[in-house]
Amino acid sequence: MKVIILGGGVIGVTSAWYLVQQGHEVIVVDRQSSAAEETSAGNAGQISPGYATPWGAPGIPLKAVKWMFQKHAPLAIRPDGSLFQLRWMWQMLRNCDASHYAMNKSRMVRIAEYSRDCIRQLRQDTGIEYEGRQGGTLQLFRDQKQFDNAANDIAVLKQEGVAYELLTAEQLKSAEPALEHVSHKLTGGLRLPNDETGDCQIFTKKLAKMAEEAGVTFLFNKEIKHLLFDGDKVTGVQCHDGLLTADHYVVAMGSYSTEFLKNKITIPVYPLKGYSLTMPIIDASRAPTSTILDETYKIAVTRFDNRIRVGGMAEVVGFNLNILKSRCETLKMVVQDLYEGGGDISKATFWTGLRPMTPDGTPIVGPTAYRNLSLNTGHGTLGWTMACGSGQLLADLISGNKTAIAADDLSVFRYIDGFNTKLLRPGQKLDAVY
């Protein structure tokens, strides 16, 4: 089968890799000059299934109000003038109760855990290197309430069979020795020993090269205009320089997927702006050995080979890619507060990108009402964490293979009123109930 994938970030490239491994003829189309030049270029570097957590959570509405008046707030909301922004925020608020939070986190952890298994297998099969480390992740708490609230996440981790360690402030140095200097500022942490780290851009570019060697065609510097339809079927994709046709089409365009599919498929994917800082290490003893997540500021600090990557925060501001000085100051403040002297802050470089976020935090992976059109988007801040699993899952769905994990509630159909996988008859296709 000939498959065209629209989007050359980590989601599009992993989709291409797994599809070509199953014998398909694959073409990847992207407007950039090479793979992973947008959202996949500068993320925080964490592969953290256990921290796969919806932004829509109990208490978030009240916290959002408080954050409006804080200098280093993890979330900022500024009107972009669109009705879609208001609708998306309302949908997220509707997911901020305990029952929705538990359901959404369970879905996210499922695909994230599977994805980590997939990247481990990929690493074993190919030997791909991307400055990766398998040292676990550590969520840091700065007050007792955060420490106590970890019980809610631990309940889901137990349910999903995810290994964890709840550490006191004094025990943090066993996982991250450099934190010994700042243990008095912390109340403890939640460590997930099976999580990983790595440079997403390096990984994506190397996998793209491997995919090309395996037969995938990459068409870069190509502006994608729109899809052509005939009834319930896609007949082609119009680009700036001509028409491309295939048997099946995959939209993996991140935050731009929503507008691209407008008037054909409604998906609630909104651009959540994030920031990162990268600096060279000057004292390894004061740098992280793996990665931490500061729960107060929602900022991750990750160790690459000779660099420290600091990333996080969220701005609901539309497609705005301006780098704000205040956000850069927050990144600098957090890394200097926890790992002072570990990196050369004077040589820090800054980046911003748009994470494709759904209101329930769960990605959209799978079929649509159009029989030869699939989606792989909406991974939010966890695109790197979920990429390989999403790519493998999508390839299996397109190939008609039995999937390794439940997939129905990861598709766009979950947004249909009254959606319930239990109502589906055995063998019934989801597009029949659209």
From Swiss-Prot:
Belongs to the DadA oxidoreductase family. It comes from Proteus mirabilis (strain HI4320). It catalyses: a D-alpha-amino acid + A + H2O = a 2-oxocarboxylate + AH2 + NH4(+). Pathway: Amino-acid degradation; D-alanine degradation; NH(3) and pyruvate from D-alanine: step 1/1. Its cofactor is FAD. One of its GO terms (biological process) is D-alanine catabolic process. One of its GO terms (cellular component) is cytoplasm. Signal peptide: none annotated. Oxidative deamination of D-amino acids. This is D-amino acid dehydrogenase. Its EC number is 1.4.99.-. One of its GO terms (molecular function) is D-amino-acid dehydrogenase activity. InterPro entries: DadA, FAD-dep_OxRdtase, FAD/NAD-bd_sf. Keywords: FAD, Flavoprotein, Oxidoreductase. FAD binds at residues 3-17.
